[in-house]
């Protein structure tokens, strides 16, 4: 990298300054929006990056609502966790292998382009061909329902396989679910962060978080409104019209992915090349030394305590959020049945409310000193936010589910029907589950993701992308898959289809996870602070 030379005819010296001078001004801002630490000449790139992130998030959120609506209507809440436990891990491993191979041949930006093209093709193919022909390319709607109907399989203790059969019976909706999950892992969690980090310094990345969160909140809010409007519209039209509206929305989202690619290419050509401050010269000898490290990156990954700890941090969040979500979603299905509502309508309604809570919470937090917490030594507090919410879930999700299954259904597998003949409180269960599930996602956006990106920016950039492919691209989904495997195993052991009946076991697992999580974050906090104080890249801490 060479030093940028100022033109003699440059009329606005404000555009060309060192990063230290730029930060001195943005951290001296006052007024209502003082916590948005962006300089005037940074706004074009920040706004375009935020727009890119916002559209990516909107596709992810709307597609997530659609896939869940279809799955709740045509399958079972536990079906989605079977997909996560059986199909998601090999798909994640395949994509990580492809990314690692691709990064040895192409730049991260080019791999981002290829991924967007593939997803756009999948969504358009699904809307034009797969979904309209589902009646011809998959088994009859009643195939699994006839096999397991009237308790035929309960005497054989294999009734728990009912959600599994539905996954294969309704494989088109399973395919949509899998595509949506991989979009979240690859595009939202991995490629956008890699792209944004490639065009930003470490300190810029930390300052831009607040603007990204505004974009994220607006996108989630708009997605929630669209979901609720779509839900209301579906309730008043015929089945064929519902199907047509669903297909059109899928095709619009597939076309939007093409628009994301076009926006990214425009940014790379017109917006990002413009410098925002004087670039310092980097010594050639340092670059050569770091290239040697890049050749050893793969071997170092398996020997590094730091990278294992980051991976475990991501895994534990995935397991915890999955156990909470599984119990909450089963409660939604039970609540819909108890109140005589359609599961699709009920699920869409609660999804919309959840996203409105998330969006409003993010917008409120934006105008606080939150974005400066990492810079002021608050990494451990941000990283610990999901742990606090996990502790709250012990009471708000698992305890109330423990009560309701005892009052309304077969009781808890360990303690039986302790509350038999009592009135179930599904409104309370669904409401507390909604708040907790939304809080877990808020904790991810404001805590887990921010702290993870902060520690990622302390890793040497020449092999940061390959490491992030492991703990972002792989462990993010493997954590959810591991949580789903746990759910599937528990339903199999006790031959049940309602995961709420093992809420006592899930609660015990959450307590164990919280204890492990605490010590991992304590170690990561110590390593991060040492690197920040020394103003160096973080030590990989090999065994």
From Swiss-Prot:
Span of the signal peptide: none
GO CC terms in record: membrane; mitosome
Ribonucleoprotein found in the keyword field: no
Superkingdom per UniProt: Eukaryota
InterPro entries registered for this protein in UniProt: ADP_ATP_car_bac_type (IPR004667)
Pfam family membership, one: TLC
Membrane topology listed for this record: Multi-pass membrane protein
Alphabetical keyword list: ATP-binding, Membrane, Mitosome, Nucleotide-binding, Transmembrane, Transmembrane helix, Transport
Transmembrane residue ranges: 46-66, 86-106, 111-131, 175-195, 209-229, 243-263, 306-326, 346-366, 382-402, 504-524
UniProt GO MF annotations: ATP binding; ATP:ADP antiporter activity
Cellular location(s): Mitosome membrane
Function of the protein: ATP transporter involved in the uptake of ATP from the parasite cell cytoplasm into the mitosome matrix. Equilibrates nucleotide pools across a concentration gradient between both sides of the mitosome membrane.
Family: Belongs to the ADP/ATP translocase tlc family.
Name of the molecule in the record: ADP,ATP carrier protein 3
Gene designation per UniProt: NTT3
């Amino acid at each position: 990298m060479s030093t940028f030379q100022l033109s003699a005819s440059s009329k606005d010296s404000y555009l060309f300054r060192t990063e230290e001078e730029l930060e001195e001004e943005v951290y001296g801002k006052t007024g209502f929006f003082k916590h948005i630490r962006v300089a005037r000449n940074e706004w074009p790139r920040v706004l375009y990056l935020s727009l890119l992130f916002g559209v990516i998030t909107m596709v992810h959120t709307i597609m997530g609502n659609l896939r869940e609506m279809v799955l709740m209507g045509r399958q079972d809440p536990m079906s989605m966790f079977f997909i996560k436990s059986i199909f998601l891990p090999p798909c994640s491993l395949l994509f990580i292998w492809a990314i690692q191979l691709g990064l040895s041949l192409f730049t991260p930006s080019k791999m981002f382009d290829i991924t967007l093209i593939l997803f756009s093709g999948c969504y358009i193919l699904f809307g034009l061909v797969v979904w309209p022909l589902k009646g011809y390319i998959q088994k009859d709607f009643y195939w699994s329902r006839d096999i397991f109907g009237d308790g035929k399989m309960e005497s054989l203790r294999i009734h728990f396989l009912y959600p599994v059969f539905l996954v294969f019976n309704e494989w088109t909706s399973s395919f949509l679910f899998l595509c949506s999950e991989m979009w979240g892992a690859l595009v939202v969690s991995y490629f956008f962060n890699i792209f944004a980090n490639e065009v930003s310094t470490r300190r810029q990345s930390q300052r831009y978080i607040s603007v990204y969160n505004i974009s994220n909140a607006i996108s989630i809010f708009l997605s929630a409104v669209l979901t609720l409007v779509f839900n209301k519209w579906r309730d008043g039209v015929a089945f064929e019209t519902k199907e047509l509206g669903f297909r059109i929305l899928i095709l619009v989202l597939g076309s939007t992915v093409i628009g994301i690619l076009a926006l990214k290419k425009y940014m790379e050509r017109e917006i990002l090349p413009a410098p925002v401050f004087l670039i310092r010269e980097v010594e050639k000898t340092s670059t050569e030394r770091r290239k040697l490290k890049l050749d050893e990156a793969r071997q170092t990954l398996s020997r590094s305590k730091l990278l294992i700890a980051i991976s475990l941090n991501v895994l534990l969040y995935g397991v915890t959020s999955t156990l909470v979500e599984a119990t909450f979603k089963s409660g939604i299905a039970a609540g819909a049945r108890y109140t005589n509502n359609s599961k699709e309508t009920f699920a869409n309604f609660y999804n919309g409310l959840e996203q409105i809570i998330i969006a409003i919470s993010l917008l409120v937090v934006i105008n606080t000193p939150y974005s400066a917490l990492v810079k002021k030594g608050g990494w451990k507090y941000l990283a610990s936010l999901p742990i606090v919410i996990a502790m709250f879930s012990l009471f708000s999700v698992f305890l109330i589910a423990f009560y309701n299954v005892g009052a309304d259904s077969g009781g808890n597998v360990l303690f039986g029907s302790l509350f038999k003949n009592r009135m179930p409180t599904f409104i309370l269960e669904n409401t507390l589950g909604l708040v907790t599930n939304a809080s877990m996602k808020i904790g991810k956006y404001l805590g887990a993701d921010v702290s993870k990106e902060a520690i990622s920016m302390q890793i040497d950039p020449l092999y940061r992308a390959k490491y992030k492919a492991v703990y972002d691209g792989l462990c993010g989904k493997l954590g959810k898959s591991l949580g789903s495997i746990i759910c599937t195993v528990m339903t199999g052991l006790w031959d049940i289809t309602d995961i709420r009946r093992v809420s006592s076991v899930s609660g015990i697992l959450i307590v164990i996870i919280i204890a492990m999580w605490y010590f991992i974050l304590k170690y990561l906090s110590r390593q991060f602070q040492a690197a920040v104080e020394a103003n160096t890249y973080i030590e990989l801490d090999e065994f």
